[in-house]
Amino acid sequence: MSKSTAEIRQAFLDFFHSKGHQVVASSSLVPHNDPTLLFTNAGMNQFKDVFLGLDKRNYSRATTSQRCVRAGGKHNDLENVGYTARHHTFFEMLGNFSFGDYFKHDAIQFAWELLTSEKWFALPKERLWVTVYESDDEAYEIWEKEVGIPRERIIRIGDNKGAPYASDNFWQMGDTGPCGPCTEIFYDHGDHIWGGPPGSPEEDGDRYIEIWNIVFMQFNRQADGTMEPLPKPSVDTGMGLERIAAVLQHVNSNYDIDLFRTLIQAVAKVTGATDLSNKSLRVIADHIRSCAFLIADGVMPANENRGYVLRRIIRRAVRHGNMLGAKETFFYKLVGPLIDVMGSAGEDLKRQQAQVEQVLKTEEEQFARTLERGLALLDEELAKLSGDTLDGETAFRLYDTYGFPVDLTADVCRERNIKVDEAGFEAAMEEQRRRAREASGFGADYNAMIRVDSASEFKGYDHLELNGKVTALFVDGKAVDAINAGQEAVVVLDQTPFYAESGGQVGDKGELKGANFSFAVEDTQKYGQAIGHIGKLAAGSLKVGDAVQADVDEARRARIRLNHSATHLMHAALRQVLGTHVSQKGSLVNDKVLRFDFSHNEAMKPEEIRAVEDLVNTQIRRNLPIETNIMDLEAAKAKGAMALFGEKYDERVRVLSMGDFSTELCGGTHASRTGDIGLFRIISESGTAAGVRRIEAVTGEGAIATVHADSDRLSEVAHLLKGDSNNLADKVRSVLERTRQLEKELQQLKEQAAAQESANLSSKAIDVNGVKLLVSELSGVEPKMLRTMVDDLKNQLGSTIIVLATVVEGKVSLIAGVSKDVTDRVKAGELIGMVAQQVGGKGGGRPDMAQAGGTDAAALPAALASVKGWVSAKLQ
């Protein structure tokens, strides 16, 4: 009996655990502090800083089953999903990693044992082929002489992509940074399936399928292309869970494994589809995985960056549901079946199920309102099409008006063998191109990053003043031995009381000083295991090895501590008031304000905001002790400690508790007791994205200052209204009612004046070929009154053409009216367009009524004078 996908995942982790590897949980799909990535797309992403030497772990061997997304940016599989056997937007990457521990020999032997041992995957050895980089003789000999694979099944792959080291078998993190040769393992499905071995002309067939890639990181590529050997070579491997499941379950398509069969049946059930071979079922089954896990990891549908990619995937899935005949919202209903089929890998998703379902449902409802109209427009355009290419302007209009991503339009067109002019689409979408570049233009030169071999010891929990030693200096990212007065630099110490920005809390400010120098610290940041003090040398000189006294700005740190502790109280209060679906999506804690982003699908009601404020202030008055404990990450989670969004944690974590009210993982600085906070006030609540709200609040002296400011404003208003705070609301209501009455009377007077003006104007009309023509510029008339005047004049004059204009604050307003019996010869829209063009504007409207605006008031007299000639020509 073949193993289930869940059993295969667990077997992989168990095997490497038995080989001394630390089992590490999957990291977020949103890369932590990595500007080079749109989404986590490989198992090694969470270990990138370890491979770069910027981070150290308490283990040298690791194994993971990493959730990955490839849709957008460099790795974009979206358009192929559902149409091939192995493309996905979401997949799990099984991997084992060595950080300067074992290398080629053990990595190859581990892979062979797992794949072929009867105890593990028991694949037939004769079905396995391998590739190595052309010059990697070491790997070749291990496969041939130690593993025993015949030479004919070991294939050398050279530089097959047009440049040195540009090869399927040479892995590179980027243009610079760690890289090295790799060996890939392929499974031969048999000669009943078309395809040839890797490196052959038929290699794109489905007979030989890559199942495992083992990368040997042994070089550091410099900007000039030279390869420097790494002091500690490492190993990074990746095996797609879905691919190995297909092999072990004896099926040729990933969509035929147990996990996808279950999801496809769930999709069919919620959409009413009966043909289980329909490709739309595969598309939706894939897309629910990426969408659900992206939302669970904090990504929300939006019009830029990661949120835009998510929106594209959701809308593609909804469109395929529409094709299957779904009559109502369906996509969110697949979250439950997904959680069931993911097993232990779906635990994070299960905790946020309600929030994920709500976001998907809201997005689908919004798109459903325009989908039908958009598809109808596309059908119209395709019906008129004479060639085989849809123009880019139409594709852009679908995007701009109906929210159709161009790949969705391309999807529809592909089903009818029609191409989309994507170049034309891009040309018509300049602003969106800017957004797309922001979304996918992630890139960095790893060798330009500050690298510090030493670590800094943070002692700021207990000290605000400390003596330390300079271990490194950096100017413009480059290490230097000394700096002089006036230079900006990053100073690294062996130990420091300065807190480096992390977990939403800003870095400390302060001073590093000695007998002959003073360095003003404006910010503090982490660089791997080192803490960098960023600032400017105000006086003297400073060199590596110097002793310094590090003084944190104590008053600023105190305010930050209060705000950070209040953030924890507010998080717990929000979950009590709004529900346990609330989870942190981002935060900023500085010395002036605390800002907290959280998952919630609607604006908070005033009474909810008040309830949160009251609950937090109640905990402040309780004067709860704020305590910290260091424990294992899993033990902390079992205790119910909440983790911060987007934060990366070590195996040992700091757990912060505030009595029985709040327990969170946090490395920040905090008050000693909740009573130290003094007072908490919410100053704003707003939305930042679909399903994400933001609260800004103040504490302590800052909160008291807002109370005083509110009181001062109230007193000022009371003084202006000649009342006091006790009857202020009644006074305001009285003033508003009086204002409304006066505005009504004023409007009546304006209408009377306009009617009188219309009566006066009618006598100025002239006859042009039997039609009354009236053209006039009016002074002191509001633009919105022009329409009423035109209606009155049309009633008075009969067969008529009218053009009225007024100038307010330098802006021209125009209106044209044409009686219906004349519209076959003169159209108001054409007439107003002719006049508007002369005053720097444009406009339009119906044949009988049109409006326009302009910016060139000086040109108005000449423009109005041109009307008679234009009308005369039309009426001949």
Swiss-Prot record:
Task: Indicate where the modification N6-acetyllysine is found in the sequence.
Answer: 74
Q: Where does the UniProt annotation place the signal sequence?
A: none
UniProt keyword terms in alphabetical order? Acetylation, Aminoacyl-tRNA synthetase, ATP-binding, Cytoplasm, Ligase, Metal-binding, Nucleotide-binding, Protein biosynthesis, RNA-binding, tRNA-binding, Zinc
Q: Which CDD domains match?
A: AlaRS_core
Textual note on the cofactor: Binds 1 zinc ion per subunit.
Please identify the protein, giving its name as recorded: Alanine--tRNA ligase
Domain of life from the UniProt record:
Bacteria
Family statement drawn from the similarity comment of this UniProt entry: Belongs to the class-II aminoacyl-tRNA synthetase family.
> What PANTHER family would the database entry show?
ALANINE--TRNA LIGASE, CYTOPLASMIC, ALANYL-TRNA SYNTHETASE
Per the record, the GO terms for biological process are: alanyl-tRNA aminoacylation; negative regulation of DNA-templated transcription
Amino acids binding Zn(2+): 564, 568, 666, 670
State its cofactor: Zn(2+)
Q: Give the multimer and partner information.
A: Homotetramer.
According to UniProt, the reaction catalysed is: tRNA(Ala) + L-alanine + ATP = L-alanyl-tRNA(Ala) + AMP + diphosphate
To which species is this protein native? Answer: Escherichia coli (strain ATCC 8739 / DSM 1576 / NBRC 3972 / NCIMB 8545 / WDCM 00012 / Crooks)
| KW Manganese (keyword) present | no
**For this UniProt entry, what's an example GO CC term?**
cytosol
**First-level EC class:** ligase
What EC numbers are recorded for this enzyme?
Answer: 6.1.1.7
Q: What does this protein do?
A: Catalyzes the attachment of alanine to tRNA(Ala) in a two-step reaction: alanine is first activated by ATP to form Ala-AMP and then transferred to the acceptor end of tRNA(Ala). Also edits incorrectly charged Ser-tRNA(Ala) and Gly-tRNA(Ala) via its editing domain.
Among InterPro entries, the record links this protein to: aa-tRNA-synth_II/BPL/LPL, Ala-tRNA-lgiase_IIc, Ala-tRNA-ligase_IIc_anticod-bd, Ala-tRNA-synth_IIc_core, Ala-tRNA-synth_IIc_N, Ala-tRNA_ligase, Ala_tRNA_ligase_euk/bac, DHHA1_dom
An example Gene Ontology molecular-function term: alanine-tRNA ligase activity
For this protein, the record's NCBIfam families field holds: alaS
Q: Where in the cell is it found?
A: Cytoplasm
Print the domain comment field.
Answer: Consists of three domains; the N-terminal catalytic domain, the editing domain and the C-terminal C-Ala domain. The editing domain removes incorrectly charged amino acids, while the C-Ala domain, along with tRNA(Ala), serves as a bridge to cooperatively bring together the editing and aminoacylation centers thus stimulating deacylation of misacylated tRNAs.
Q: Show the disulfide pairing.
A: none
